[in-house]
């Protein structure tokens, strides 16, 4: 792709993270906050940093897309989302690396900052986070975003902080830190405007790292939506996400990729082994919505016991064929009739030679 077609390449290798390119989730946030620091009058840069911080916090705290599903606990997750946004913005604004130093503003730093603030002994009835927020100007956005947590009772605030810590705890992995603590050579804005390809390699033997793949896909797609909205609702280049083994990834808010992505020139190609994987991860309704939003379906290579073959045989529909019988005897007779038959029966689908596929297209 790089040598022949001239693509800019990034390889995020979760199987061997020490050989992987970086993928710092705070790259765009840091970049725009640095631009605002250089030119305080550049309000647009600050607004973009805040927007990307909100996208990241929502992706981490509410991967399913909506805190309402948590019922009475929705307050804690919404507050945790605002709190994490504030933490990320504080890191981006006040902890830039000095000349010659490596980037130290990343998601692990966010965890350490929360942990350090919780460890600070109370001063005049306030914890470390409240003391830090008091140092900010009253109009600072980080202070506003964390307002729900700051104004709640001590026990409620502790629950909000614990929610943030529990979500960030998943990133504490020595190998994984070799990826998420270093900037990516490709960010969402570059990905949408240049010839770029990102290869994401998952370790089949260690499904614990699959969550980071789902997180990267979800965060990148939301950033691409934001980029598209700044350019009349369409990306400059068409973006295609080939998601092999999507059925083995943890469920995430995938439905907007189908419903909102198409109009923005962003296409998702989910590759699964069985329709049952979608139903297991997204429920019956979610699986139906995903299938209904796929304009083209390519399938083949079914196992002998596959139930997916039955479902796809029904989806192919039927045709009318002429059927009958002929009897030979003293009085020869024949009987012909028109009957309905599946276009391809499940047995016929299962017997398709390896390497051959059936394609169903819309229109």
State what each model feature region is.
Residues 1-266, 281, 342-363:
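P-loop NTPase motor domains
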